């Protein structure tokens, strides 16, 4: 049985694409082991999928605090030592880095031991760890074109239910009446969207006002309910959404941030979107992610400093369903629906090459 060591953690944008690839290879009979941080989101999500785990304590490489800088050498040393021990224990046929701080010590130790290393960069701007690992990896893959010099563009893996959503022309057929608006704030909620969207909807004549579903984040749900009540606007307000595929499929327009996984899902589904990049993302990578869709007519890009209720209301009022269908169709044309399979195939090829040596 071949063994894949997946290294990913920190955010769902790293973890869920890793799960998509892991499921591909588990279906082909591979053993899956996941390297992550025991204090990260992966510690809750990964065991739910039944994978073996290998925990490495390793945090951010960047930081302004003096203490963080002073402790960096110790942080690196501990991370390298723990990763080396786990790699020797697991003896993987292939090591796959999907992003997050833990990929750095794990990837460097994989290269040191001569284990085949695949690096996948999800964002339009490569992170620090992946920029370093690209120099020692056997294969470098990317979710966006032109991210790293020697990267093969395969797209970002998305869940099977997202990739299986019907195309835009089939979904939009027979639609009439008010537009359906889906607002997605993410697991923590996007406070600026929670504040601005109800005020924008209140500016739109009730006869034209979209039917809205707004995912707020559990901690911000009560504040969102108060904001909608104050604005005199009705909406389906949710702390989280389990079935994103169905919600995407029903929406005429999605208003959201521009994380790599979100952008990949919008393309896979074929959904028109208004993207408000998180302005404090490392290297402003969310703006680059959003531009991938916006530059090709598949999305509107609205920088957060320019976001206000009046402008948002004006954009929504100007949109007709046929134009949104055109945007959705352009988004779908940019999809890489077989990204998970492509990454899995690269792992298969490296494992086969290793056995021949």
UniProtKB/Swiss-Prot annotation:
Disulfide bonds: none
Gene: murG
Source species of the chain: Aromatoleum aromaticum (strain DSM 19018 / LMG 30748 / EbN1) (Azoarcus sp. (strain EbN1))
Localization per Swiss-Prot or TrEMBL: Cell inner membrane
First-listed, main subcellular location of the protein, grouped into a coarse class: membrane
Family: Belongs to the glycosyltransferase 28 family. MurG subfamily.
Keywords tagged on the record: Cell cycle, Cell division, Cell inner membrane, Cell membrane, Cell shape, Cell wall biogenesis/degradation, Glycosyltransferase, Membrane, Peptidoglycan synthesis, Transferase
Transmembrane domains' residue ranges: none
GO cellular component terms listed in the entry, alphabetical order: plasma membrane
Keyword Glycosyltransferase carried by entry: yes
Enzymatic reactions: di-trans,octa-cis-undecaprenyl diphospho-N-acetyl-alpha-D-muramoyl-L-alanyl-D-glutamyl-meso-2,6-diaminopimeloyl-D-alanyl-D-alanine + UDP-N-acetyl-alpha-D-glucosamine = di-trans,octa-cis-undecaprenyl diphospho-[N-acetyl-alpha-D-glucosaminyl-(1->4)]-N-acetyl-alpha-D-muramoyl-L-alanyl-D-glutamyl-meso-2,6-diaminopimeloyl-D-alanyl-D-alanine + UDP + H(+)
Membrane topology qualifier: Peripheral membrane protein
Record-linked InterPro entries: GlcNAc_MurG (IPR006009), Glyco_trans_28_C (IPR007235), GlycoTrans_28_N (IPR004276)
Pathway where it operates: Cell wall biogenesis; peptidoglycan biosynthesis
Function: Cell wall formation. Catalyzes the transfer of a GlcNAc subunit on undecaprenyl-pyrophosphoryl-MurNAc-pentapeptide (lipid intermediate I) to form undecaprenyl-pyrophosphoryl-MurNAc-(pentapeptide)GlcNAc (lipid intermediate II).
Known EC number: 2.4.1.227
Molecular-function annotations in GO: UDP-N-acetyl-D-glucosamine:N-acetylmuramoyl-L-alanyl-D-glutamyl-meso-2,6-diaminopimelyl-D-alanyl-D-alanine-diphosphoundecaprenol 4-beta-N-acetylglucosaminlytransferase activity; undecaprenyldiphospho-muramoylpentapeptide beta-N-acetylglucosaminyltransferase activity
Highest taxon above the source species: Bacteria
Protein name per the record: UDP-N-acetylglucosamine--N-acetylmuramyl-(pentapeptide) pyrophosphoryl-undecaprenol N-acetylglucosamine transferase
Residue sites binding UDP-N-acetyl-alpha-D-glucosamine per the record: 11-13, 123, 159, 187, 241, 260-265, 286
Pfam families membership: Glyco_tran_28_C, Glyco_transf_28
Signal peptide range in chain numbering: none
């Amino acid at each position: 049985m071949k063994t894949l060591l997946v290294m990913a953690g920190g955010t769902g944008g790293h973890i869920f694409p890793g799960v998509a690839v892991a499921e591909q290879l588990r279906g082909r009979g591979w053993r899956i082991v996941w390297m992550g941080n025991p204090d990260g989101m992966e510690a809750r999500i990964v065991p739910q999928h039944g994978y073996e785990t290998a925990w490495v304590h390793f945090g951010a490489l960047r930081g302004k605090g003096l203490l963080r800088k002073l402790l960096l050498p110790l942080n690196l040393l501990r991370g390298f030592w723990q990763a080396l021990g786990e790699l020797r224990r697991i003896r993987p046929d292939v090591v796959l880095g999907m992003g997050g701080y833990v990929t750095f010590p794990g990837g460097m130790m994989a290269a040191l031991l001569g284990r085949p290393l695949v690096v996948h960069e999800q964002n339009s701007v490569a992170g620090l760890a992946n920029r370093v690992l690209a120099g020692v990896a056997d294969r470098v893959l990317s979710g966006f074109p032109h991210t790293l010099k020697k990267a093969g563009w395969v797209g970002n893996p998305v869940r099977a239910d997202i990739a299986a959503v019907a195309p835009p022309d089939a979904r939009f057929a027979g639609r009439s009446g008010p537009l359906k608006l889906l607002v997605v704030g993410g697991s923590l909620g996007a406070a600026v969207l929670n504040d601005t969207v109800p005020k924008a909807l209140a500016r739109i004549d009730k006869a034209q006002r979209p039917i809205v579903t707004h995912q707020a984040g559990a901690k911000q749900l009560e504040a969102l309910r108060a904001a909608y009540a104050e604005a005199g606007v009705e909406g389906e307000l949710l702390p989280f959404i389990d079935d994103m595929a169905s919600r995407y499929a029903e929406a005429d327009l999605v208003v959201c941030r521009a994380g790599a996984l979100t952008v990949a899902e919008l393309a896979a589904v074929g959904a028109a979107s208004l993207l408000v990049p998180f302005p404090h993302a490392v290297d402003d990578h969310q703006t680059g992610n959003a531009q991938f869709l916006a530059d090709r007519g598949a999305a509107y890009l609205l920088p957060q400093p320019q976001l206000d209720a009046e402008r948002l209301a004006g954009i929504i009022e100007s949109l007709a369903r046929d134009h949104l269908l055109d945007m959705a169709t352009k988004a779908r044309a940019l999809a890489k629906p077989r990204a998970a399979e492509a990454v899995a195939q690269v792992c298969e090829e490296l494992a086969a090459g290793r056995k021949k040596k």
